Amino acid sequence: MIITQVELYKSPVKLKEPFKISLGILTHANNVIVRIHTASGHIGYGECSPFMTIHGESMDTAFIVGQYLAKGLIGTSCLDIVSNSLLMDAIIYGNSCIKSAFNIALYDLAAQHAGLPLYAFLGGKKDKIIQTDYTVSIDEPHKMAADAVQIKKNGFEIIKVKVGGSKELDVERIRMIREAAGDSITLRIDANQGWSVETAIETLTLLEPYNIQHCEEPVSRNLYTALPKIRQACRIPIMADESCCNSFDAERLIQIQACDSFNLKLSKSAGITNALNIIRLAEQAHMPVQVGGFLESRLGFTAAAHVALVSKTICYYDFDTPLMFEADPVRGGIVYQQRGIIEVPETAGLGAGYQKDYLSGLEKICIN
């Protein structure tokens, strides 16, 4: 299973509607696809969705850095995943997003070689239901309430709401959404680092009557030492997202009792290898974990869904963004069923790829 060729593709996909969070507005998912070929004829797929405000990467930078990573991996064994992860770290510091795409492709190949679906290769089992939420982008309260009603009509039972503005506006957003969607809907909120410490405490306290499941990343990730104060002052559980990128972050947050749960994303952790380390730390600390992502296609979320089956500590799922795409370029992969329930493929490996017609229209570079 020697790596002989790597293909990189720029993959911009238009969204049905602009995706708005406190950090900015996106009209496209600007992703990068990685295809790794081996001497045995196997092909492994990976994908990443860079956010400049979170990863410090873009589609263009990931495409360039990916070429350096590809050159380093040519001639190595795709089965030496840990060694190849260390090799990528030696080639360039950071750049976790593009590294995650390579790491996913390596795991795809390794699971194919083992003849197992990826979740089974990772030691996971299909012993639980994966039910995704659906996100309401940040907007005017009446628009967000209308969106929540439509999401409920579409059969989703869990709604994630983007907040992170003024205290008054965020409370009005949640009040109107709860009234419009009703008490049967599970509500989660995500501030995307949008509040100050004081605003976070005040806003979360005012939101307590609305039965919020948890709040993701209330303040800047640089203010992670303030999370214990927020957690102690409020009854709504705190989930670390941007402040938890790797196992070192997770261990630090556990030590200072900064949060109630982690939001795990493969492109933050540079892929599956370090994601598994975070999961083990969460298990030891008896902390629940959410698995989510950015604006990956169904292929990226197929990888995330396989990972979600490796531990019972993973109990929250945020896999909705492929449903926001105008067109679906993926063949195989996860299947969205009623109520937001997700079926994970049984095919050996990742069980997902891209339509040939789609790839042929993308900007591409091949490294041998």
Swiss-Prot record:
What InterPro entries does this protein map onto?
A: Dipeptide_epimerase (IPR034603), Enolase-like_C_sf (IPR036849), Enolase-like_N (IPR029017), Enolase_C-like (IPR029065), Mandelate_racemase_C (IPR013342), Mandelate_racemase_N_dom (IPR013341)
Q: What molecular function terms (GO) are annotated for this protein? A: magnesium ion binding; racemase and epimerase activity; racemase and epimerase activity, acting on amino acids and derivatives
UniProt KW S-adenosyl-L-methionine keyword: no
Keyword terms of this UniProt record: Isomerase, Magnesium, Metal-binding
Query: What is the uppermost EC class here?
Result: isomerase
Record: residues binding Mg(2+): 190, 216, 241
Question: Which GO biological-process labels does this protein carry?
Answer: peptide metabolic process
The record describes how the cofactor is bound as: Binds 1 Mg(2+) ion per subunit.
Q: Which CDD domains match?
A: L-Ala-DL-Glu_epimerase
Q: Does the keyword Magnesium apply?
A: yes
* Chain residues that bind substrate: 135, 160-162, 265, 318-320
| Pfam families, A to Z | MR_MLE_C, MR_MLE_N
PANTHER family listed in its UniProt record: O-SUCCINYLBENZOATE SYNTHASE, O-SUCCINYLBENZOATE SYNTHASE-RELATED
Which family would the database say this protein is a member of? Belongs to the mandelate racemase/muconate lactonizing enzyme family.
Q: What is this protein called?
A: D-Ala-D/L-Ala epimerase
Per the UniProt entry, what species is this protein from, by scientific name? Answer: Cytophaga hutchinsonii (strain ATCC 33406 / DSM 1761 / CIP 103989 / NBRC 15051 / NCIMB 9469 / D465)
